[in-house]
Amino acid sequence: MTPTATAVETARPMIVGIAGGSGSGKTSLVRALAANLGDTQVSQLSHDAYYRDRSAVPMTVRATLDYDVPEAFDQDLFLAHLAALREGVTIRAPRYCFETHCRLGEGDEVGAKPVVLVDGILLLWDPAVRAAFDLSIFLDVPERMRLERRLARDVGERGRSTASVLRQFDATVRPAHATYVQPTQPLADVVLGNVGRLEPLAEIASALVLDRLARRARARAGAA
């Protein structure tokens, strides 16, 4: 039976970071967790929304930039929004267009619900971001499977060609994974392999979140 979080109350949002390489299934796990825990209990935020706006850069240059390094992100805004959510303040995350590499203004509101699920490839690289998480999960997936998933996503959802996705993977994604993503795996609270069906993985992750929520509730009760 799928657990629900409705019986567990928290004093402030519990922020859960879900990290891992491109194509590791982070977004899919976030959606499954939200379904398991209940949409009324969960907010979702993607680090991808915080890519820097490249509207001032010629399109021919934008296509050659490296989007898999820490400098590609507006980290100051991301940290400010995480801090606001921790304080119970609703934020409005940016909207980013992957086809044009431009920011499209403000997106939907992200409320400070009992659980805030955050996903991104470089979530654990920045110590300040790591410190914002009450629980961090790293999804460990073999490179071949990550590439297959990235191809399906970028070609099917982001208007990319197969050739361009493969070029980018070889030029920037693979080296950045080795330099910035994989070294953060030991920094996660929990490492989960995501090579099979999503449902069992989501059940495990849901149980981890509920356990942390229950611990916080017990700690508050003991301090009262």
Mark where each language-model region is.
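ATP-dependent NMP and nucleoside kinases share a basic, alpha-helical "lid"
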Residues: 104-156
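P-loop (Walker A) phosphate-binding loop of NTP-binding proteins
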Residues: 21
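Hydrophobic positions on the alpha1 helix immediately C-terminal to the Walker A/P-loop
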Residues: 29
